[in-house]
Amino acid sequence: MNHFEKFIGQYRNLNREIYVLFWGRIVTSMGSLIWPLLTLILKNKLGYDATTIALITMVMSILQFPMLLLGGKLADSRNRKHIIVSCDLVTVGCCILAGLIPLSNISIALYYIASVFATIEGPSYDALVADLSDSDSREKAYSLQYLGMNLGLVLAPTLGGLLFENYLWLAFLITAGATLSSTLLIIIFIKRLSVEKAHISQYEQDRQEVSLISILRERKSVVLYALVGGFGSFVYAQFNYLLPLNMESLYGAKGAEIFGLLTSVNALVVILATPLVTTFLGKIRDVKKLLIGQTLIVLGLYSFRYVQLQMALYFLLMVIFTIGEVFKTLGEQPYMTRRIPATHWGRVNSFVSIVSGAFSSVGNLFLGRLLDSQGYSVAWLAVGLAGIGLIILAYLLSETDKKAFPLLYAEK
């Protein structure tokens, strides 16, 4: 009981708005039925091959790049609550339309439009969490948001897998309803958009007149962080690209159900591991968490190459992968907000997201061609090689961070 109280107690005394955002994350994630199955929808329902799926993903990612820049600029210059609500309403409308029409390329286009507006609001959502916490409580605030997202995801992918064959239209409508419910929570209960901070890192001080380029030149380790994010995004993307394709090749349409179960296991392990890591390993620095997390992600995901048709091992590897995801997320979310002026959080977030999106989309196109020509074993090998590069970059970041931001280490 004492341990349970310790786990829950670490999330006490955060600002009320953080808890509202937490419940909003839960509700939204409960309706996230489409995105885990998107690759399988394109493959199984619409008949695209792996290369074409990767090309579609790359084109959509390229189209989102200017939206990321717009989202970052808006997050740094406009009311963040208004941005989130406006984008959510567009997302709801698109998902309702996609659910009401017969499944086709138009349905996918509507879903991608919805995802574009979700992309625009992303920097505002992340910056709002940072605005409502200070440097000391930020990791717990982000940890709570991450926990909420995965609480909602425990059943969503499994439900999506069950609806996949005959009731996919209903999955679109459930996604719309969940997003609308979350939006109403924000409209009604989010009143403050920032709080007085007890502790502000010197690196967070406002610098209104300084450009994004100047900040990146001045803090070059942030560019290295973006490269880690790029390689990491490509490797992590295989959870929703190569892995479901592999399941579909082994089990046919039933692969969607198996992948849905794996995704639910992912969410369940996050729920169990997040408070444990935050409570007992909270003193590990964010850059070290990144290194540990990326290493476990590479190990857990790449090992699927060696366990084809061994169902029990799928779930063991998913546990390893997910523990890595927890470390990575708890490291990367506070990283930038402690090292970047508050006036630039949105734009730097957009820059990192663009790098990540470019790596994952171009990488998936290459991987799709490799998969179509050489098969799954070679494709997984390519993921492993990229993973080695990722681990090296994450190690370099952890070693250079103290020199780049010495005051953060003096504060401990």
Question: Which residues does each predicted region cover?
Answer:
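Conserved MFS/SLC helix-loop-helix module at the cytosolic interface between two early adjacent transmembrane helices
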Residues: 65-102
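Juxtamembrane intracellular "pre-TM" segments in multi-pass secondary transporters
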Residues: 1-15, 193-225, 411-412
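Helix-loop junctions at membrane interfaces in 12-TM secondary transporters
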Residues: 99-111, 305-317
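Residue-level signature of mid-helix packing/kink "hotspots" within the transmembrane helices
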Residues: 33, 61-69, 153-154, 267-275, ...
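Cytoplasmic helix-loop-helix junction between adjacent transmembrane helices
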Residues: 112-149
